[in-house]
């Protein structure tokens, strides 16, 4: 089964003919379910958010050295146990993102073209905003969802580790989440942030592309 989606803002009218560049996307087959498609779409989003937008990059590099592949963590992140008590805004975010992934897909080419034409005419014969879900929602995740990110990441980490997460590793993971948040700058409300006490050389860790475990880079405690 396939569906259709517009590529960016590649649509216009030429000599009274409406044209729209698009993709035909395979969303299921005899060996690939629709749920598999959504799983791949979630992975694509998270890899972009972490490795292009640097969403919690310190944390994810750290847990990689705990033996947890990013794909495994991302899968847990998007499939929380709905019978457990999770932050409402977290559940709302992943549900909204899923709806956005599905809304960009159209059952037929004709539906896709009709939707693009509707947007074009509503904007006075001009294109609308580009559908850049990875960028838009990745930015939202990095800057607008901080109230739930830390407890959710730490809870998933503990669950993936089957309760065997040491207090030292939990504290370090928590510190690295705080470090990522300290790196963010609110240009509308610039204020001085409280420094972190850190006893691992994260600067050289990053410089060396996170090749070795952070535990190997112990140093005297410094303010960062």
Question: Model-predicted segments: where are they?
Answer:
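C-terminal non-catalytic alpha-helical accessory regions
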Residues: 38-147
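Charge-dense, extended regions
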Residues: 113-224
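A structural motif corresponding to the C-terminal lobe/cap of the Radical SAM core domain
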Residues: 1-69, 195-203, 210-224
């Amino acid at each position: 089964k396939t569906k259709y989606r517009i590529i960016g803002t590649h649509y216009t009218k030429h000599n009274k003919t409406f044209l729209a560049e698009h993709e035909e996307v395979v969303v299921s087959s005899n060996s690939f379910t629709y749920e598999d498609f959504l799983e791949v779409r979630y992975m694509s989003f998270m890899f972009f958010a972490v490795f292009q937008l640097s969403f919690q990059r310190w944390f994810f590099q750290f847990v990689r050295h705990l033996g947890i592949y990013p794909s495994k963590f991302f899968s847990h992140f998007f499939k929380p146990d709905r019978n457990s008590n999770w932050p409402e805004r977290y559940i709302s975010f992943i549900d909204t993102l899923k709806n956005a992934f599905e809304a960009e897909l159209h059952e037929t080419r004709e539906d896709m073209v009709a939707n693009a034409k509707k947007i074009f005419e509503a904007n006075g014969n001009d294109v609308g905003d580009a559908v850049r879900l990875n960028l838009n929602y990745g930015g939202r995740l990095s800057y607008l969802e901080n109230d739930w990110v830390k407890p959710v990441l730490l809870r998933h980490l503990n669950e993936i580790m089957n309760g065997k997460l040491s207090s030292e590793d939990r504290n370090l993971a928590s510190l690295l989440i705080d470090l990522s948040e300290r790196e963010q700058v609110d240009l509308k409300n610039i204020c001085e942030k409280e420094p972190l006490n850190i006893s691992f050389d994260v600067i050289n860790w990053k410089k060396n592309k996170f090749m070795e475990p952070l535990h190997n880079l112990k140093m005297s405690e410094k303010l960062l």
